């Protein structure tokens, strides 16, 4: 993605969060000069990969497959004294935008609808050979309540409600078309997005 596209996405996200009275940590708003001024104080932020991550996952279709993420806090796998003992992120989606289908091996996460539109989720089990199971039903938990969905069936999560995603379950989620953008929250185990995302759709 071009730097101009990334900057525009951050600006739009901040405006959307402000509209919903959701404030990010101070470093979310720093200018390049402020990052330079604080460069001796941000080793932990760098190590736990805190901050903005705007990506189209190599799709070239950001408005369809992509997300605007901000890691508020995280720890470091294998280093319990670094950062926080859990992770928290905000994921912001344009209307109709979603993540590519993927699963995790280590991470368990709660995904919460924090504001604006409706979150649309789809689940698929993983076959023993690693491929996606497009046929079997999936049991999932929404705020502790067990639910069952058919493979690939859209599940709609309204504001304030959440879904727990467990390892080895393929999933995708984003903003339901027709309901506007989405602010989603993620609370999870400490994680490393560079090593624990296994995609079932092409990414780069």
Regions found by a protein language model. Give the residues of each.
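A short, N-terminal "cap"/entry segment at the start of jelly-roll beta-barrel domains
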Residues: 1-86
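Double-stranded beta-helix
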Residues: 2, 128-150, 172-204
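Short amphipathic
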Residues: 92, 153-156
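Glycine- and acidic-residue-biased ligand/ion/polar-headgroup-sensing regions
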Residues: 94-95, 107-109, 113-129, 134, ...
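Short beta-strand His + acidic residue motifs that chelate non-heme Fe in jelly-roll/DSBH
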Residues: 100-102, 111, 121-122, 155, ...
């Amino acid at each position: 993605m071009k730097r101009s596209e990334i900057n525009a996405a951050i600006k739009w996200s901040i405006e959307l969060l402000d509209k919903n009275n959701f404030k990010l940590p101070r470093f979310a708003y720093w200018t390049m000069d402020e990052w330079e001024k604080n460069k001796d104080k941000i080793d932990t932020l760098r190590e736990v990969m805190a901050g903005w991550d705007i990506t189209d996952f190599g799709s070239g279709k950001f408005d369809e497959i992509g997300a605007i993420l901000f890691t508020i806090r995280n720890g470091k796998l294998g280093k319990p004294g670094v950062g926080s003992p859990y992770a928290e992120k905000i994921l912001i989606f344009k209307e109709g935008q979603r993540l590519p289908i993927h699963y995790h091996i280590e991470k368990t996460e709660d995904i919460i609808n924090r504001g604006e539109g409706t979150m649309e989720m789809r689940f698929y089990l993983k076959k023993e050979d690693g491929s996606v199971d497009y046929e079997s039903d999936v049991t999932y938990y929404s705020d502790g309540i067990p639910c069952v969905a058919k493979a690939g069936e859209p599940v709609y999560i309204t504001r304030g409600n959440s879904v727990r995603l467990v390892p080895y379950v393929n999933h995708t989620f984003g903003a339901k078309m027709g309901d506007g953008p989405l602010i989603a929250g993620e609370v999870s185990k400490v994680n490393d997005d560079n090593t624990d995302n296994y995609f079932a759709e092409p990414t780069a």
